[in-house]
């Protein structure tokens, strides 16, 4: 049996690598230097799919994806949400009191302020969380530590001194999963997500007209982001995620209005939602106050 391959941007042990292993257990993972290299690996047949980080609950959107995907000849075939659980790691034998410097990616460094302040560690920026773990293992010095994933510690033979050192417990990264071909989902498939890239004229009310159909047709929009194009400071390109299948009556009408009022529109993918979305909805529902009970009790 041929083992399938999924490509990701980063070093072995990066959170993208962890996302690949979680979403596609049993697949071979292929590390790539850049997002462009990751997409090229799939386009050239070196990998079956690509795991592409698109947004983080703390850091916001991941740049470049909106410019790379439309011209890559790939389809978004799925999504994955990966909890980011930072671990403080060092060589075996090192204790917390030995650590002087902490190495990690700048985004991760911005998520561990409490750790740095509590232990008065000196922060040192590196190109990658997993790359920082590789360096700490290579240097083999007790005073050096890295903040990265548990997988990075395992792959580099490092000892985890503290787990979950991130400031926010809800730190989660969302990924698009892209492939050369896609299985066409039936309009009756439950929990479908559609990703659309579109451009509007730089005129007053253009975006309002484009999006009006989604409101009137009751379509839930989960993501809308603007981008500058061609060196212009005018935001005319938008990336949008909406719930529903393009052939569903309501979404079909909304997309027809979008196409009528926009300069261009391109569906990047139609895929099933991650189970993470249902879990989040249940969690929010459970956390919502019961106004009836509160009123009676009050």
Where is each model-derived feature located?
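Domain-level signature for soluble enzymes in the chorismate/prephenate branch of the shikimate pathway
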Residues: 1-298
